[in-house]
């Protein structure tokens, strides 16, 4: 359903932000 789609999108979005933060703090990927 729609809620599952929203949850999945939110999870991917959050993981993406965490990954970007790690890259900036860690100095590259």
Swiss-Prot record:
The keyword Disulfide bond applies. Keywords: Amphibian defense peptide, Antibiotic, Antimicrobial, Disulfide bond, Secreted. The keyword Ribosomal protein does not apply. Disulfide bonds join 23-29. It is found in: Secreted. GO terms for cellular component: extracellular region. It comes from the Eukaryota. GO terms for biological process: defense response to bacterium. Expressed by the skin glands. Antibacterial activity against representative Gram-negative and Gram-positive bacteria. Belongs to the frog skin active peptide (FSAP) family. Brevinin subfamily. This is Brevinin-2Td. It comes from Rana temporaria. The lineage of its organism: Eukaryota, Metazoa, Chordata, Craniata, Vertebrata.
